[in-house]
Amino acid sequence: MYRFCKGLRNCLQWKKSTFNLYNTPQMENVTLKRIAEVLGLSISTVSRALKNHPDISTATKKRVNEIAEFLDYEPNINAINLRAKSNRVLGLIVPTISGFFYDSFIAAVEEECRLNDYRLMILQSGNDPQIEINNLSICRQNRVSGLFVCLSINTNSMAAFDKFKEADIPLIFFDKVPDGENYNKVCIADMEAAKMAAAMLIEKKKKKILSLFGSKSLSISRRRLEAYNNVMLREQDVVIDVEHCSSTQEARNITKQYFSKKEKPDAVFCMSDEILIGVMKSLNEMKIDIPSKAGVISLSDGFLPSIYTPEITYIETSGYKLGKLAFTRMMNCMDNKNEPVELFTNSPFVSGGSL
């Protein structure tokens, strides 16, 4: 008891010394060595006590943990990783964090990281290929154990990504993915979702449809357009106007352009939430009644359609489900099941009042 009280007194004196005359904290990391000095124990005993080692008595564990908590001790993760020759950090690069799809994807991955004792480092590319390359460099410098990437719309070279493959670091592409069979990819069931939307427009007897897709450079846009056209082009009395847009503002401008014409569309298909925002902004500004004057259907994560009146009919493209699938694939890759595969989530139809 005397030894513990003496240790606590030393601890209080040391903690007091970390504050200057103006009570401003002088940042000093609490180490195992410092805790050992305070308690008069060896560093190895302190370390094992904090790890709840069976060779350490309950009383000693209690003393060590109380002092560690009092001093706000935090383990040195870098030192632990160095000893274990591993780094339980995963990187995640997205074009932007804002946006319901990416938010929900990140939430799912972060949730799984927490449950599996990983940390997550999130970086934004802003759809700038140079920033994307810089982010890859940051991930390599931090020795991430694996990396999730949604490509920027302007990515035109995979050379920087291939360095991760050469270093045997698992790399999972999601949503906006590269062409080819040499990469691990997790995707929404793009083609099925687009087919479902096209079939629903036909079922609702829409005849002149403004169809808005993402950038032509993205495989996700090309796949969705191909599947959509395969359904639509079988209908000889249906006119589809296909446009590509890479931003909400561009979608807004295109929608305004088409609904300013004498022969207006009677429906709009939106390939993504980003496009849907621009479309709805324009239709509301022009006072186009939905669905009597124009129907709207979108591929969506599901949150955005619920904020409009009437609610938007959509095909679900869940970022949360995709995030869960991506993490599972990452764990499989780390278990040496790293042969490139392309996995898909399902895309259910959700009826609103907009069609």
Show the residue positions of the predicted features.
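Short helix-capping segments at alpha-helix termini
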Residues: 115-116, 167, 232-238, 261-264, ...
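Hinge/beta->alpha junction and helix N-cap segments in small-molecule ligand-binding domains
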Residues: 95-104, 122-131, 176, 185-196, ...
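Flexible loop/turn connectors
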Residues: 9-12, 256, 260-355
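Alpha-helical recognition/docking segments in bacterial nutrient-uptake
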Residues: 2-27, 31, 85-199, 259-260
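Short beta-strand segments enriched in small/hydrophobic residues
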Residues: 38, 43-48, 82-98, 200, ...
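Glycine-rich phosphate-binding loop signature in dinucleotide/nucleotide-binding domains
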Residues: 71, 141-143, 204-205, 258-264
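N-terminal helix-turn-helix DNA-binding module of bacterial transcription factors
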Residues: 2-87, 355
